[in-house]
Amino acid sequence: MNDSRYIGRFAPTPSGFLHFGSLVAALASWLDARAVNGRWLLRVEDTDPPREMPGARDAILQTLERYGLEWDGEVVFQSQRHPAYAQVVDRMFNMGLAYACTCSRKQLEGYNGIYPGFCRNAGHAREGAAIRLRVPELIYRFTDRVQGTFQQHLGREVGDFVIQRRDGLYAYQLAVVLDDAWQGVTDIVRGADLLDNTPRQLYLQELLGFSQPRYLHIPLIVQPDGHKLGKSYRSPPLEASQATPLLLRALRALGQEADPQLLTATPAEVLAVARQRWQPEAIAQRTTVPEADLY
């Protein structure tokens, strides 16, 4: 199959080094793009400087290169996109689609992450406040290529959500939607932990007149205690010397054929074979896969 219109992306955060869970996500999005001769973009989501680890940006790029996951075009850094985000936040605020919120974390305790609307009609000034987007009392639903139909009532299950924090930093939901549209992304392949973020992004896309990408949410790799592999749980960083065996293990996590004879192959050779054999329909329709099952 050949679809030169396909544009995918991998968007890591530089809060730490890439780990095995990152590799599975990167590999899935890379293969989905390359299998149809599409483009694969790299975007570093560095919108939260306090959480950024020194040296992580360069390490992420180097690791992807050593694992053979080459991207198209220039790397985009979200920290360079602030003027675009500011313009949209200003427009939404001035149109009454968003409002200033002065609620503290303590005030919101006990609401299970669902904003109760305390500041919705308060008319607070913007200075020193977060900016929340008003959400409709509607159900947003989409069909994921692996997980099937997913739906969420934005008003009841999320509430008005933050698009700019009180410290001035821009929220993930806003930045990801603006950047995917700006880069012309047609297909988003990412971890199932972001499945319930998607309806908020669909609403933003609708509000801003953007087309909706196709979505594919892969199972998360989890540790024995059920936590996903991640920087906050000190998952070991990827080592260049282990590229081939880890790529093969990542293929197994995605339900793909991982020929043991490729253990002596280079990362580029493993990827060339995997690209030809890519079958997204073989990915398990589940949200987690225990890491122990992959050995």
UniProtKB/Swiss-Prot annotation:
The keyword Nuclease does not apply. ATP binds at K231. Gene3D superfamilies: Glutamyl-tRNA Synthetase, Domain 3, HUPs. Keywords: Aminoacyl-tRNA synthetase, ATP-binding, Ligase, Metal-binding, Nucleotide-binding, Zinc. Binds 1 zinc ion per subunit. Its cofactor is Zn(2+). A motif ('HIGH' region) lies at residues 12-22. Zn(2+) binds at C101, C103, Y115, C119. Disulfide bonds: none annotated. GO terms for cellular component: cytosol. L-glutamate binds at R9, F10, A11, P12, T13, E45, Y172, R190. One of its GO terms (molecular function) is zinc ion binding. A motif ('KMSKS' region) lies at residues 228-232. Belongs to the class-I aminoacyl-tRNA synthetase family. GluQ subfamily. Catalyzes the tRNA-independent activation of glutamate in presence of ATP and the subsequent transfer of glutamate onto a tRNA(Asp). Glutamate is transferred on the 2-amino-5-(4,5-dihydroxy-2-cyclopenten-1-yl) moiety of the queuosine in the wobble position of the QUC anticodon. This is Glutamyl-Q tRNA(Asp) synthetase. The lineage of its organism: Bacteria, Pseudomonadati, Pseudomonadota, Gammaproteobacteria, Pseudomonadales. The gene is gluQ.
